Structures are given as C-alpha cells and as structure tokens.
Amino acid sequence: MKGYTLTTKTKKNIRVLKLFLISLIFVLIAVSIAIIGCNYIGNRNFKETFYSVSSLKVNNKVRIIQISDLHNCSYGKDNIKLLDRVKKLKPDLIVYTGDIVDSKAKSNDRVISLCKELADVAPSYYIYGNNEVEMYYDIPLTQESLDKKFGFNDNNRQPDKLLEITDDLTRKLEATGVKVLKNKSDTITIGTTDVDIYGVLTSNPSSFWSYAGESFDEYMYSNENNLKITAIHEPLVFEEYSPDSWGDLMLAGHNHGGTVKIPMIGPLYTHDGGFLPDRGGHYV
C-alpha cells in the first residue's frame, strides 16, 4: 500500500475550496431569506394599479374595482386596510375575479366577511377561480372531465347540467348581496350607463366554448349598445381569439405576476408561462 502526503500547496487549495463552499452556502441562505422575506411582505400588502378605459358606450364615469387572488389573506385585522381603501375610492362596481378563497384554508369566514362589507359599498360580482373549483367541484373543469362526469359528447352536451351543481360558498356569498356569475351574465345600470357583465366558470380553453359558448354569445350579441365586461379567472382563453371577441373590457387574475418573484428582476416562473415569463404585474 502506498501512502500519499499532501503538499503545503494542496492543503492550502483545499482550505480555500472549503472557505469558498462555506461562503457560497451562506450567500445562498441569505438570498433565500431575502426572497422569502420579500414575498412574505408582498403577500401582506397590496399595490394599486389604475387603468383608464374609454368607450363610446359610457355616458358617465364608471369606477370599477377588481379584486383577485387574495387566497384568504387579510390586510390588517379583519381586512381593515383593504376595506378602508376600497371605501375611500368609492367604486361604482366591484368584481372579484377568483381565488379569493384558498383551497387549503379551514374556513372561508374571512372572505364572506370581506364580501359582506364591500357589498354595502357597491354592487359586487364574484367569479370562481381554480381554488374555488378545487374546493367545491370534484373534477377539473375541462371538457374531457365534464363530458365524462355527465356522460356527454358533442351530440348530447347540456351545459346547464354543470350549473345545477350548488355549493355552500355561493349560498353564503349571495346571502351577503354578492352575485356569483357562473357562465352567465347580469345587467346593471350605473348612472345612465347600462353595463352587461359576464362571469366565466369554465375558463379552461378546452371547455369554454362547449360549456359557456351559447350563453356567452347571447351576452355578446344582445343589447349590443350596453358596455360589455367579461370577467374570468384564468386568462388563457383570451389569447385564443382577437381582443374584440370578448367585449369592451376584460378582467382576469390567476397569474399573480409570477409564482416566484425575484426582487428587482420580477417573475421567475409561472405554471402557465414557464421560466422568466413575459407576463407580470399586480392583479390585486
């Protein structure tokens, strides 16, 4: 057996390598803590984004507040920060575009309380997101899954069968005065402006036209002088057709501006857009 003796130079190189690895580990830990901290703070503060949209169908100013992807979060005790800000803005209409609840939460009382308070501020509409669907439907709302559940095919499909499914969240929301739109529309008059709002339940591109197409066409092509607002959670179906296919104003959520966000860089990954997606921004 041969013995090996490390030279002084080799020992020095090993010490340098160990020091480098230890330093690298500390840097990675520090970066991870910074990212987690920034995301934690960001998830407990909301940022407002204002958009101005013009339409010849509007006779007076209409202020709409869109709230999306809260995931059962509270901004201050009993959501006081969010409530106070919404009240101060004095909206004419409030639209919740899904994932206000969190499928892992034990209770939706916080969401119901928020919606009840804001229903006294302005007429409110609620559209289901994937978290609501996960909680109250036993299948993903794709065409394949829905057809299999109901025994449908292209020749016998009855979209209204899906709408016959009721759930506790809808009952509680509507008891507060919030209207839940599931592949249906409603009309509201704000000042002298008539507004039609359509809420999409089957936002998956595979099931949108087969389960919402008939009611959506009726919404789009009746009362054409009314302002048309289409509200949806997952926006992918909007990319399937030209913007003028969806009405005068489109409201969506879901992407959060990135599932993981790096400070100063932005979204690292979204489950729809992959790594370093072009999509970004604040949706709440």
Predicted features by range, described:
Residues 68-72, 98-100, 130-133, 184-185, ...:
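Active-site metal-binding loops of divalent metal-dependent hydrolases
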Residues 1-58:
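N-terminal membrane-anchoring alpha-helices
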Residues 49-55, 184-191, 281-284:
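Short acidic-hydrophobic surface loop/beta-edge motif
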Residues 139-140, 145-178, 184, 190-232, ...:
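Binuclear metal-dependent hydrolase catalytic cores centered on His/Asp/Glu-rich metal-binding motifs
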Residues 62, 93, 195, 227-229, ...:
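Structural motif
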Residues 60-164, 168-171, 176-179:
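Membrane-embedded segments
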Residues 235-284:
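Conserved beta-sheet core of the metallophosphoesterase superfamily
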Residues 45-76, 213-229:
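Mobile, glycine- and charge-enriched loop segments
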